[in-house]
């Protein structure tokens, strides 16, 4: 009997496997979702399974908390303006060392441990991410002031060729969000936005934001207020009405950016929920919030 | 919580999916296992799922009961010698019409209904199965007598080219066990033996016999006596000791034939058990009997 | 001298071989043209030769007389409305068994015997023919009445992928005209119409109707009245003037359907004429009637 | 009736077309066989037909008579030793101009005129024929004397890559027998021998020598003494017994060279016989002499 | 130190190598530029180097002086009208023998000697150049008179398929400017014009005219008056003002023809300047005159 | 004149470009050779040029000095035994961050800046380097003692698939020498030895050690004592005689390892010499020491 249930559950996944066969899913794997070994294992197994059943995950990861820790170790105080890290030369060096030299490799190792073949990359390789310095404006005394965030960039162009090759050869690409400008300078990118840009360029079907919240909720302390499905206009309405505020707003903007770039749906799931990615994709009800254009 | 269990079950399949990735499994789908709609649906879903997760099923089907019914309708009495159907011209016509014209198409339809792409074939297409008339001997009064079974054949050569093309292009081939001799005459083949021959020629990893028994049991009425794993020598021992008798013996010979042809393991499962194929492949304990060389 | 003539005849075919190189010809092989062994050999040899000289035949076959015989054997009376077979469940079963289980295999065998590589298929495999139930209307007392023909369908969509693969790999596809509707039900198709639909979908250059008449004649008893070449408007004119009547009209409609679907020319030839297909294609004068758009 | 005969003749070619499908035939087209326009047309049509029915002709041509004429026009006297043209620098220039600049192009033109796609080459292109200076010995007063033939070479290595590409892309290569030594000097090659070397390197099934004789005859004036099939040992026997003498001996040696290099059969046919190549290949009895190893 | 200079020079070529990577350059190699062994070596080495660094040269050669010499040897007087050779049948034969049988092969040999893989072709092979008889008009007594130049043609269509294959397989094609009309007659083509036509058809980036002058100069005796870069309108201006006259005008027209056909720039360089092709391409200043559309 | 010299120098490289076309060169780029911006530019330009002229560089880099600096900044003292870095967990983290997160990216950036397409990798991606913990022995009081170096490994297996794909798609792979053991733990590898192992696995023609010495010299202060070419036995002789001592010995062992693994020649060049790689490859005399088997 228990056996039968197992089989039924496998079979339940079949329509989803058929539907998403050969599609690309961009997984934005946030630093806050990498809280413990177990959570990291859940994600890794989910992504390897996706790959084996014919869906192509492409990972863009963050690493904010770890970067902060490394900075503090070196006696530097992290500073953010509008959710973007102020990045001087020394900070950029730390960002790259932590993202590319540590977190990226850890994700690759986990994926390979569970049977996947992964390739760690930054936006520097194969001219993957061409970026330009981001000009940030701030309103002060009802005047627009230009703020210098340092070596912070925004995506100008994504050259998908290298990723296409790797995906086609059955690798899972794992990308650190560092871009290069036309002078060859590295730039620190916001991982959420970059993920949306890459998803759009790759014609990804879905962008799945693996975060540390369950999704968009009316009341963050009440799981029953979680929205399963929202349209952009509903979200804009919620922002206007003050239901969505603070740190969530830049993430929401990244979601809308992805939809604008051609992604069909964006999903916010909680990396601390066991196998959240798999459940969001392979079950009717899902576990997080799905955002669609309309 | 229930969600979590679902995901865990999917993930449990991962090592098996990795291990069998890109391999070929020959599914011998027996006529006695096609007892009802539900059982046929279970098998079809299992095979489509296998295909989508990167394992390549190739189906060889039987159809004995249905052939008998058709013959009786036409006023002919089915006759068997040593488990092989005596096949005159008229019988051969009925065999072909039922196998190729009915059962094969029904299997193809089921597979396509659940999202697979299937192609129905007989051994006549693409010179798939070159056969020769089978010479059957009988011991009578301690004398070896040659028996004429009529248009009954045994496989001489399997040309895998057509199947290779179809498998590579992501189709599930469904094969009726009719062969052709060098004069172009059709011959009725024993589906169990033919399945083993095709499995060997295709370098299939497994031959899965979907039957109407749970496997090899010491006492057919006591499920607890089911053997999970047997070697050829253990089986030979069981035959010698009289544990395996009667109608099971030709099937066992077909299993040994497959192992001789290079198949790594043969599995006997019960098509009436829900999702028997999936459970046999994707769970540690399995549901039937696995036979290996040693 | 005789030798020389032989060579000259081979060479005469050269311009046609050049002209039609790599093109696809849809051969509608009618049940009435399969009258005897010799006639079946002629056709088979013609098609194998076409394949070897670089022209790609695709066969769609009928089988009306054989189906009628099988039905009568089972005590059923064939019934037709407007040339379409009224098809209840039992009839459909017989149609499939005869077409797929018998005639299709016989054609495949013949082709393979003369050196071709053939693959027998029905519209069920590889989602080849998606069909829908045909709604037939009848005029009665100047009122349009809807007639239920049972499991009779018309082609909704032809998925050419499987055929393309087989043709490219140098197989001759032989197709039984059975389609599948969106619920997975099989439907009996008119072979003439289906052949035109497949020809159009495959971008076939020619549709060759192998029948039991020499072509379109003003007087069916006077061979000298055979038309070698007709345009659609000439044919419409002949119908209006009553030169073409009765059973020929549905066939003519099938020809016009094929031209509408993009076929360059439709040819009606007599399968009882030795090597009619070859002669129609490879000689200036031809042996049957060619119909072109204008 | 006449129509029927035509078709039968086409069909008679079928077994040969099947048998030789995709094989390569090396056609040595001798200068003496290019006697008139009509004969040149026969050969060209034969080769184009071969190509279209799936057999791949590769042409190596001679041009002795035309070279002699050109030399005489320039006031030079052709000189031969053991059938090899003594070749000083000026002669080599004439040889190249006539072979590459005239005869090769004429053959290409004829082939293209009848629907073929041909490419004219010499052994200079694509390092096709690496040659070395031929050391010729002469017995004089029972002493072996080395003779300097000038710029005459023998094949050292055939690089088949260029020809393989052209054949695969459906071109007919037409090759002038000029080789290049390791210092980059051009060398005049004996076309018969070179044809055998190229045939061997290309794994050609047949070498067909298109000459101005009907084959090997016991009495050159009695057509009835023509041998249809000979083995090497039979030929050696004939030479010993004096049946084969004079100018025929070097040609025979070229035939044996080809068989040694792996060609299955060598055919000697008369280019003045209409469609000799076609008849030799596509009829049971042939028109010339076939030589096989044993 | 000297070593360092060597390396610097190699490195200086890098931006040009990057820029022109995988592009096609049409090299028109004029007969007047083949003056001596050394000059021929320079060109050959330049082209082989280009090929190895990833730029694809395609050579169209002339051979006027050599043709004249051959004609005179045969007692014929070369005759030109408006720079086009009057070409009777005998002249055409000489043209083909010299161009295809001699000069083409010499270029191929040189290229192969320096490590290239070259293939000699005329416009006759692979239907490369389809031409038509050129109608030439002359003004006489202010009347337009049609002049018969004999077998002189102009390009009607270039079939790039053969060249594409050869370039892709890493060969350097060397083309003699002989075309074929629709009746299969060979026609003598002006090499300058043909080179432009082929360059356009092949989507060549550059047409490089290797001549015996340094480029376009205001005063042909004063090297310092050489124009490095000119636009079409500047050139037209120069012609109008009488700076460009005589034999240079047809060459200029050929340049403009190439630009019209889509070539990005045409270069006139002096084949007697050591490595003129390399220097023109790989140095900032160049050595000849570059002509661009505007 | 100067122009001519430039061209001559380009042409001088031609034989080397031909000879090494399509081969793979493993470049071991040592940390001591990355002393200044200019030296890093020289190397980057050299490698990009190699790639463009058809030679495939694969880079394995070191980074010792930079790792030391980073460790010291964090208050850790680098410790070496027999030239291998003692590597505790914290050290390994620093090693990875510096190698993968900083140096690797810097090399990639330089290569891309000069027109190359580079991909940064560690041995973790695509299961590139499977390693095992290195057991190091020390002789102490004439007793062999096992020393624990911590997370230090040696290459067990190189999976070339990912590199093969990247090389074939025209990328320059840049590899940080970090391996993974069977438990998924990262291990710090000696870059010299790893470079030889990868070179052998990739069938590289050459291993070029870019160091901070000019090569092997009898007297390190006397440039004139530099050996241009040495065999293994000559080197062993020099070691025995005490000409090669100290820090050079492990490097020499790495060279011999590479030759053992099948590399044809190992070159030691000085990264501070302008364009040392290019000069070593493209000039007769070279600039460093070449070591060959015999």
From Swiss-Prot, chains A, B, C, D, E, F:
Biological process annotations from GO: arginine biosynthetic process via ornithine; L-arginine biosynthetic process
EC top class named in words: transferase
Pfam families tied to this protein: AA_kinase
InterPro entries found in the cross-reference section: AceGlu_kinase-like_sf, AcgluKinase_fam, ArgB, Asp/Glu/Uridylate_kinase, Glu/AcGlu_kinase, NAGK-C
Pathway noted in the entry: Amino-acid biosynthesis; L-arginine biosynthesis; N(2)-acetyl-L-ornithine from L-glutamate: step 2/4
GO cellular component, one term: cytoplasm
Catalytic activity: N-acetyl-L-glutamate + ATP = N-acetyl-L-glutamyl 5-phosphate + ADP
Site keyed Transition state stabilizer: positions: 28, 251
Top-rank taxon: Archaea
Subcellular location per the Swiss-Prot or TrEMBL entry: Cytoplasm
Residue numbers binding substrate: 63-64, 85, 188
EC number annotated for this UniProt entry: 2.7.2.8
CDD domains per the UniProt record, alphabetical: AAK_NAGK-C
Keyword Amino-acid biosynthesis: yes
Single GO MF annotation: ATP binding
Entry keywords, A to Z: Amino-acid biosynthesis, Arginine biosynthesis, ATP-binding, Cytoplasm, Kinase, Nucleotide-binding, Transferase
Family to which this protein belongs: Belongs to the acetylglutamate kinase family. ArgB subfamily.
Function description: Catalyzes the ATP-dependent phosphorylation of N-acetyl-L-glutamate.
NCBIfam families with a match to the protein in the record: argB
Protein name, per record: Acetylglutamate kinase
Gene (name only): argB
């Amino acid at each position: 009997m228990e056996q039968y249930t197992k089989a039924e559950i496998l079979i339940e996944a079949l329509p989803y496997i058929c539907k998403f066969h050969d599609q690309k899913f961009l997984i934005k794997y946030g630093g806050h979702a990498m809280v413990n070994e177990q959570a990291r294992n859940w994600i890794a197994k989910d992504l390897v399974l996706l790959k084996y059943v014919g869906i192509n995950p492409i990972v863009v990861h963050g690493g904010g908390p770890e970067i902060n820790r490394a900075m503090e170790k070196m006696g530097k105080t992290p500073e953010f303006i509008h959710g973007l890290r102020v990045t001087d030369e020394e900070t950029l060096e730390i960002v790259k060392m932590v993202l590319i030299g540590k977190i990226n490799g850890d994700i690759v190792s986990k994926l390979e441990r569970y049977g996947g073949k992964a390739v760690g990359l930054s936006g520097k390789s194969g001219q993957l991410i061409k970026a330009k310095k981001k000009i940030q404006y701030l309103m002060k005394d009802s005047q627009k002031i230009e703020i210098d965030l340092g070596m912070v960039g925004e995506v100008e162009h994504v050259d998908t060729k290298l990723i296409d090759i790797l995906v086609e050869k059955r690798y899972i690409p794992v990308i650190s969000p560092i871009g290069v400008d036309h002078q060859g300078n590295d730039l620190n990118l916001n991982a959420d936005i970059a993920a949306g840009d890459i998803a759009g360029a790759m014609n990804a079907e879905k962008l799945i934001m693996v975060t540390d919240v369950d999704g968009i909720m009316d009341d963050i302390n009440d799981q029953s207020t979680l929205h399963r499905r929202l349209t952009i206009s509903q979200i804009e309405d919620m922002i206007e009405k003050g239901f969505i505020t603070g740190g969530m707003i830049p993430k929401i903007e990244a979601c809308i950016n992805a939809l604008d770039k051609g992604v069909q749906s964006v999903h916010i799931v909680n990396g601390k929920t066991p196998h959240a990615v798999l459940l969001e994709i392979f079950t009717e009800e899902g576990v997080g919030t799905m955002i669609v254009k309309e």
